[in-house]
Design a protein with these regions (language model features):
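Terminal accessory/targeting
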Residues: 1-26, 38, 42-51, 164-230
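Catalytic domains of cell-wall/extracellular-matrix polysaccharide-remodeling enzymes
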Residues: 62, 73, 86-192, 196-197, ...
Length: 230
């Protein structure tokens, strides 16, 4: 009986510890490419961290596809960031579907599975997009890292200051964005020291028992609300 009680208590303690684990997800927009994406993958490999890459269909070619395949093979998730990075609320329903299908089909061609998540270009939304895109919508906490005048130090400061359990970070691996590569290299050991574990966005939602909802765009998976068109 004592052994049974001890076993039950051990399971409960392990379950509690797991549920209280602080998780964050790094995600990167605007690849793939053969420069910055490669540098980012090297940094993630150095720190043994998995992340999510939201790719633009028009950026996938024979060479950049090899980088995307590397990312997938190293345990990162490949997600959808549209075909052309257009402001999608200006598009028709058919054009929206085409933007998504083009990229999803290319990702499936090269890595063997279709994206499950979608990040809208410019985080521009309307109801037509929700009605015609059968993927989970993802936003994220940014650090203005698309602006070249934002230094690596400023990016590090912003990323560290916004850290909290359940957060998705929205960063960029477009060509020439080396300051974000530097920032990520610096913030990972700091956040690990603070008790955070890095996972992909899919894994974040899985471990936090989040079932994707319609008409929701996720930044903090533990604090969500329905999107409403203004």
């Amino acid at each position: 009986m004592k052994k049974i009680i001890f076993s039950i208590l051990s399971v409960l303690m392990c379950s509690t510890a797991f549920s209280q684990n602080k998780l964050v997800a790094l995600s990167f927009d605007d690849g793939p490419n053969t420069t910055t994406t490669v540098q980012m993958l090297d940094v993630l490999k150095k720190h043994n961290v998995k992340a999510s890459f939201f790719v633009i269909g028009k950026n996938i070619n024979d060479e950049s596809a090899k980088v995307m395949v590397r990312a997938h093979n190293e345990g990162h998730d490949i997600e959808n960031h549209s075909k052309t990075h257009s402001a999608m609320p200006t598009l028709s329903a058919d054009s929206i579907k085409s933007e998504i299908e083009f990229t999803s089909a290319l990702v499936a061609k090269y890595v063997g599975e279709r994206p499950q998540l979608f990040r809208p270009p410019y985080i521009a939304l309307n109801q037509t997009m929700f009605d015609n895109i059968d993927l989970t919508f993802i936003c994220g906490e940014g650090s203005n890292d698309w602006e070249d005048n934002v230094s690596a130090d400023q990016r590090v400061e912003k990323i560290l200051a916004s850290a909290k359990d359940g957060l998705i970070y929205l960063l960029h691996d477009f060509e020439g964005n080396g300051k974000t590569v530097e920032a990520v290299d610096r913030i990972i050991p700091v956040l690990k020291e603070r008790g955070y574990t890095f996972v992909t966005v899919r894994e974040l939602m899985k471990q936090k028992n989040i079932k994707p909802q319609k008409d929701v765009i996720y930044t903090d998976v533990l604090n969500v609300s329905k999107w409403k068109e203004k």
